[in-house]
Amino acid sequence: MDFPSRFEVIVIGGGHAGTEAALASARMGVKTLLLTHNVETLGQMSCNPAIGGIGKSHLVKEIDALGGAMAMATDKGGIQFRVLNSRKGPAVRATRAQADRVLYKAAIREILENQPNLWIFQQACDDLIVEQDQVRGVVTQMGLRILADSVVLTTGTFLGGLIHIGMQNYSGGRAGDPPSIALAQRLRELPLRVGRLKTGTPPRIDGRSVDFSVMTEQPGDTPILVMSFLGSKEQHPAQVSCWITHTNARTHEIIASNLDRSPMYSGVIEGIGPRYCPSIEDKIHRFADKESHQVFIEPEGLTTHELYPNGISTSLPFDVQLQIVRSIRGMENAHIVRPGYAIEYDYFDPRDLKYSLETKVIGGLFFAGQINGTTGYEEAGAQGLLAGTNAALRAQGRDSWCPRRDEAYIGVLVDDLITLGTQEPYRMFTSRAEYRLILREDNADLRLTEKGRELGLVDDARWAAFCTKRESIELEEQRLKSTWVRPGTQQGDAISAHFGTPLTHEYNLLNLLTRPEIDYNSLIALTGQGCADPLVAEQVEIKTKYAGYIDRQQEEIARLRASEDTRLPEDIDYTGISGLSKEIQSKLGITRPETLGQASRIPGVTPAAISLLMIHLKKRGAGRQLEQSA
């Protein structure tokens, strides 16, 4: 039977990608259905209880700048906040928050249930309705047909999910949840390239059985940070510490002597695991010369004793897991509440996607999250927001949108995926972005909120706060530029004493702020009243001190913009372009790049080949002009 309502967008899956996709679509005024196998697991943190980190917090801030939920939920559920790379420059600084799983999930659900234009329905999706290479809707587990203009798949690890603990395995989407088998089989019938990946999680420990006195305490930063541009410290629950301990020679001996019982090393697991979040058995095997590895003991929440031992993800048998845990200092008497496990799942080659995250072969079908080969809540949320936005734009008859590599880490993420593909779970790092001085986490709103407002993603409250902040930055820059300090005055003497050399002539405060010897707060302390908003002061200082570097990056971006944005026709025949090698013809034909810039980033496509493409496009354009004039 048919569902009572027809929707413009259906989102399948209620994880981090699915919630952001559904919220984005609904915020844009589009009638949206979020289909989940279990309403109680909406926004669930399936792995580590943390949001942010190097490269990842940049994505979280960008999601927030575009009106998304992840950062706001983190502020409501965050039980510890820290800045990583705090001694390095602003481009690579990152915010990381430990989150209470229950509070985070509750915050996400509250946002979902109060979002206009969004309906939630508990049913697994078993089939897609596809007609003439266009998606028309979905079929649920109980046979309901629900029609829609666009469908966003955010299936996480559920497609053909297989859980491994030692040599035993069973079907599952994650521990305690069933897999999606029927949908996985249906997707394999489509002309899309499919593979298998693997991820894992450590055993959870009862904190009452742990001796923290022999571990190193790791408190949060003070003053306490916030994740959202609209967040406040008052939203945070109680703050707690994490703890650090280490594996040792005994731990490594236990693992090495049991590798034959590991599904990874016995050939049972075929999927490739995440390079930057390896299992403990992988660490011991790959880094055999290391005497120990750090283990971060992270609280799962304020109302539970469960701990997450970050650093010992494993799929070894339970008896070996128990030996490993109890060999670690402070956990000699530890009780395991939940065993660790590995999970294999289907993913689809992201090179079969457009920049909008719509599949190239099925119109209106969008993929986001782990189905595209990524790992991490933040990467999933960023893709979900983009896919949901573009599904809504399609329903509205508007052009799709994706930020460029020089505009957002979201743009870097998508460009990497659809141009290069991935054979292992993809994780974001600041090192992946060539314009990271411009793409800082602190200026995500200045980069994206105006575009979010144009798309319909940003509400009135966020827009008003953003406009106030932007105006305050401009006013403070103007004030500093128009305020002068002269030699021999009280302010001039104070500045001279700070620098250790006398001022030789008058300077405005903006000139003085460019000097490395002084920061904004010191300058204001010496010269009088400044800006009360620390976020405004931070922007003024960074823009002033790094102005030369930022200008050079902007000039480089402008030079490359013309070729970057040159569109390649969808029907272009690369085999007919004289001078292109068969290898390059094949690579271009497989990837089907959308722009000249994307083509230039395909491995093996040379600058000479790009020149040939430019010549071909000019000839093609001239030829069509002649046809039209005739």
Swiss-Prot record:
Xref: HAMAP family: MnmG_GidA
Species: Pseudomonas syringae pv. tomato (strain ATCC BAA-871 / DC3000)
Primary gene name: mnmG
Protein family according to the UniProt entry: Belongs to the MnmG family.
Broad class of the protein's primary localization: cytoplasm
Role description: NAD-binding protein involved in the addition of a carboxymethylaminomethyl (cmnm) group at the wobble position (U34) of certain tRNAs, forming tRNA-cmnm(5)s(2)U34.
Name by which UniProt lists this protein: tRNA uridine 5-carboxymethylaminomethyl modification enzyme MnmG
Description of how the protein assembles with itself and partners: Homodimer. Heterotetramer of two MnmE and two MnmG subunits.
GO molecular function terms noted in the UniProt entry: flavin adenine dinucleotide binding
Protein origin, superkingdom: Bacteria
Gene Ontology terms: cellular component: cytosol
Binding site for FAD: G13, G14, G15, H16, A17, G18
Pfam family, one: SAM_GIDA_C
InterPro entries reported for this sequence: FAD/NAD-bd_sf (IPR036188), GIDA_C_N (IPR049312), MnmG (IPR004416), MnmG-rel (IPR002218), MnmG-rel_CS (IPR020595), MnmG_C (IPR026904), MnmG_C_subdom (IPR047001), MnmG_C_subdom_sf (IPR044920)
